[in-house]
C-alpha cells in the first residue's frame, strides 16, 4: 500500500508495528461555536498527524493500538476521511473524566459530534468497516 501524510510527523516501523508521534495540541475536530456543558468552546483543529492510504470499494481495517497517555484527550485514532469537512474517527482516548475510553467522532459538513463510549484498560483493538450501500 502507498501511504501518504497529511500533517507529517515522526514515524517508526518495527516489523508490522507502526508508531506515529503526535505533537502536543494537535487534533481533528470541527466546532461550529457550540459551548459544552462546562462552558468550554472546543477549538476547531485539523493539525494532527494523519498517515493514510486511499482505498476504493468495500474494506475492513483492524488495528491494535496502545498509547502512553499523558494529557486529557490524548488518543490513538483510526480515521476514515472523504475530505476535511466529512470524516469519522474511532479513538482510544484519555477522557476529561480521567478514564481511558472508546470515543467516536463523526464530522459531517464541517461539524463534529463526539460520544464517549465504555471505559477500557490496557491495549485495545479498533476496526473500521466501510461497505457500499
List where the protein language model places each region.
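Extracellular glycan-recognition regions
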Residues: 1-133
Amino acid at each position: 500500500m502507498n501511504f501518504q501524510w497529511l500533517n507529517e510527523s515522526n514515524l517508526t516501523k518495527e516489523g508490522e508495528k507502526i508508531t506515529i508521534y503526535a505533537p502536543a495540541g494537535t487534533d481533528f475536530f470541527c466546532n461550529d461555536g457550540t459551548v459544552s456543558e462546562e462552558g468550554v468552546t472546543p477549538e476547531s483543529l485539523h493539525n494532527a498527524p494523519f498517515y493514510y492510504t486511499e482505498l476504493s470499494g468495500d474494506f475492513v481495517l483492524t488495528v491494535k493500538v496502545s498509547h502512553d497517555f499523558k494529557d486529557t484527550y490524548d488518543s490513538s485514532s483510526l480515521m476514515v476521511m472523504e475530505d476535511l469537512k466529512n470524516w469519522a474517527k474511532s479513538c482510544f482516548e484519555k477522557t476529561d473524566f480521567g478514564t481511558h475510553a472508546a470515543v467516536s467522532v463523526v464530522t459531517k459538513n464541517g461539524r463534529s459530534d463526539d460520544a464517549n463510549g465504555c471505559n477500557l484498560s490496557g491495549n485495545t483493538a479498533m476496526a473500521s468497516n466501510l461497505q457500499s450501500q
